[in-house]
Amino acid sequence: MVKRNLSLAILLLNVLCISAQKLPTGNPADFKVKTCLHSVSYMGIWRGQATLTVDEFLVKAKALGFDGVMLAAKRPHVSLIDYDDAARQKLRARIKELGLELVCLAGYCDFTAGVDKAGIPNTEIQAIYIGELAKLAKDLGTNMVRIYTGYERPDVPYDKQYSLVVEGLQMAGKLAARYGVTLAVQNHHDIALHHDAMKWLLDEVNLPNVKAAFDCWSPTLEGLSPEEIKQAVYTMKPYIVHTTTADYKELPRYTYDLNHTNYSRKESQMRAVPIGEGFLDYKNFINALREIGYQGYIAYEMCEVLEGGGSIDNLDRSALAFLEYVKQFR
């Protein structure tokens, strides 16, 4: 009887998860621009970037005019180590006081970490970490955690690594379901980066609360054309609940070859610029989101060395440029 009741409770939570994050409706008229600022934008993670406390960031996001925020679930922002029950209650109240929506927590995981060293249950460790993030998310008043897949390690069969990602997502998804939380898998890490592979992965995971945080950045760097990116959005339509934007310029790199009195081409360095000033085609991408009736927020992040530097004033200018840019889609 106890087992039956537990199973029913888990099923109920899964049903709640399905409704917690709205999927694209297929109707363009249902699309609304809802803006979100990622706290990584003011977290001091790249050379010269200013650092704000969590409270300073919340005040900043409100003053700039964002509808919601995405909080990085690691130091120096919202780390599990630092946020006990009292701190969680205080932060939740502060977000409500400012009239902001906590769109999601940003988790930082890698399900293939340690795949080359047997004996350590790294996939379980990652899943437990994500489960704790789900509890943190619930305590703070959101029902979504952004997560990753895994980086591909050399000299380990790909399918072994892929299977760990599937296993990890299934374990993490079931833990997150206890708190009514959806996991949004971002197309960021190596495993299942391409949209066809990501769709296959999520189909295989087959949990109602494991969805996708699908961005324009990686398909562009994969070399997809605007039309192919549009079709990628359509492919991912059954899963997209979140997206994060950032724009970049390509800076070519060369090394001098003394023997040939010439230069050899190297991989380009990407540098962040205000949205609309780089090579990413966000008009095409956001219009594709509109066409599928996307229901989530459009987040903005400054997580790489930014043109103009990392001063508060320059970060603010770039954030405001994003808000101005997305007005055309309202």
What residue spans do the PLM features occupy?
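Conserved beta-strand positions in the central sheet of alpha/beta enzyme cores
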Residues: 70, 104, 146, 184, ...
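Bacterial Sec-dependent N-terminal signal peptides
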Residues: 1-25
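Active-site groove signature of glycoside hydrolases
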Residues: 136-158, 179-191
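Acidic/histidine-rich catalytic cores of soluble enzymes
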Residues: 30-32, 170-279, 283
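N-terminal pre-domain/capping segments
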Residues: 20-140, 160, 167, 177, ...
